[in-house]
Each structure stands twice: as C-alpha cells, then as structure tokens.
C-alpha cells in the first residue's frame, strides 16, 4: 500500500520555497480483458479495481452493454462478480475494460509560485527529498511529474459611468487590477476550476483597497467554466480582449 498522501505532500512542500502546492496521487492503469462466463457470471480478481470505470461488452462487439439492464455488478473482498442478463444472458464470454489503482505507485505533482511549471531539475529535487529512507516506504515507487496546464483566454466587455470611467479602467485593466488579480488567483493552486465568476466578482466589486469603484456591469465571454482535475492547473494563455462602454447606470 502506498504511503499516506499527506505525508508525501508535506515533504514536497519542504523541498523548495518556490513550491506552493502539490498533489500525491496513486497511479492508475486501464486494462482490457476477455472473461469466461460460468453459470451466467463472470469474475475478475483484484483489490484495487475502480468499478465506476467498468465497461462491459459482448465478446467481439463494439457496443457497450447497459448496466442493470444487461448486467449487474458486485465487488467484495477483492473479487468483481458480473452477473449477466438481458442481451448478455446467453453469453459464453464478455469483454471488459476497467481501471485499477497501481498499489504502491505514487505520482507527485508540484506547482510553483505564480502557477509556474517545475522543470526537470526541480522535479529531481523533489524526488531526492521524498525518496529519503525515512520518508518513502520501501514498497513504494515514486515519480514526479509537472502539472497539466489548461489554458484559458479572457474576453470581456465592461460598463462604466462617465464620472468613474478613468478609475474603473485602472481598477479593471491597470497593473494589479481585476484582471491581474484574477489571473493570480486562478493559477495559484492545483485543481482550481476555471471560474469566470471569480473574474466577474473582481471587476464588479474590487475589494483590494478602500473605496474602489468597479464596473456596474460586465459581459464575460471568456473564460467559460471548466472543472479541473487535482493534477491540472489553469494558465492564462495571454490572449486578452478587453473593451468598455460608457453609459449612465440605471438604478
């Protein structure tokens, strides 16, 4: 069994002061196999099978069978039992695809300050720390990889009154303004979903100083919301399209 994830993360964070976030995840593999059917049941052993990834097909067919209609699943004590019915009731064999966790195989994913992606030298430094004899269990195999970057563009139109136009432009587009602060927030952690509402909030309600005036309306075309995995990080692509309109606010 792999060592506790939080223990690995703790030591990764001590490897270098530029590391601001990290994940330690058990590695996985997807397997395909043909199973023989015995009295309407097929079996697959293994204590780390992820049953929610299971795909069942009639042998040699490309179309997936339907769970609860063509088969049911029971998984206990390291044995996966697939009971066939419906279109699979008479099958003599079935094809399955399933993902399993690899015991003792741990993948370390560090993130650097400002959303920086670690290079080979930094990854080697992390491995030197976590492979110490008093940290890594003897049965664990540890690797270190960079996070996967998911890029986003920014395209917005915001609205301001004539009286506050100059101030709002500075608060939205200026150095340290809403766009800069959104990008800083977005890239600061692994697995942080790309969330346009966070950009909208900073444009409409700037809160990093006293008595700051924000836009009274904003249309955010990009980015759109996107959920990220724990080992992904959002990265601003550099593609920025910003315009503003001056109107009298209707109260």
Cite the ranges covered by each PLM segment.
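Intrinsically disordered, low-complexity, polar/charged repeat-rich segments
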Residues: 31-34, 40, 45-47, 153, ...
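Residue-level signal for short segments within beta-strands and strand-turn junctions
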Residues: 58-60, 112, 203
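A broadly conserved detector of short glycine/acidic/proline-rich loop/turn motifs that flank catalytic sites
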Residues: 49, 60, 148, 160-162, ...
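An aromatic-glycine-centered, glycine-rich loop/turn in mixed alpha/beta architecture
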Residues: 165, 169-251
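Hydrophobic/anchoring residues in structured secondary elements
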Residues: 21-27, 56, 73, 220-223
């Amino acid at each position: 069994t792999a060592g506790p994830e939080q223990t690995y993360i703790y030591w990764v964070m001590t490897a270098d002061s530029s590391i601001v976030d990290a994940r330690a995840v058990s590695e996985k593999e997807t397997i395909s196999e043909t199973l023989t059917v015995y009295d309407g049941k097929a079996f697959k052993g293994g204590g780390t099978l992820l049953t929610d990834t299971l795909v069942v097909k009639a042998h040699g067919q490309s179309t997936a069978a339907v769970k609860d209609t063509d088969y049911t699943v029971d998984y206990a004590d390291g044995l996966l039992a697939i009971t066939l019915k419906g279109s699979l009731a008479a099958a003599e064999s079935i094809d399955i695809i399933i993902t399993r966790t690899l015991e003792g195989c741990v993948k370390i994913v560090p993130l650097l300050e400002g959303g920086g992606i670690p290079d080979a030298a930094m990854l080697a430094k992390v491995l030197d720390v976590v492979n110490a004899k008093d940290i890594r269990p003897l049965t664990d195999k540890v690797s270190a990889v960079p996070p996967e970057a998911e890029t986003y563009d920014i395209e917005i139109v915001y609205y301001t009154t004539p009286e506050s136009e100059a101030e709002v432009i500075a608060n939205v587009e200026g150095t340290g303004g809403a766009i800069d602060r959104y990008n800083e927030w977005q890239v600061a952690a692994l697995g942080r979903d790309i969330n346009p509402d966070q950009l909208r909030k900073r444009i409409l309600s700037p809160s990093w100083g006293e008595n700051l005036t924000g836009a009274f309306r904003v249309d955010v075309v990009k980015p759109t919301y996107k959920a990220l995995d724990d080992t992904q990080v959002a990265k601003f692509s550099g593609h920025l399209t910003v315009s503003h309109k001056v109107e009298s606010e209707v109260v």
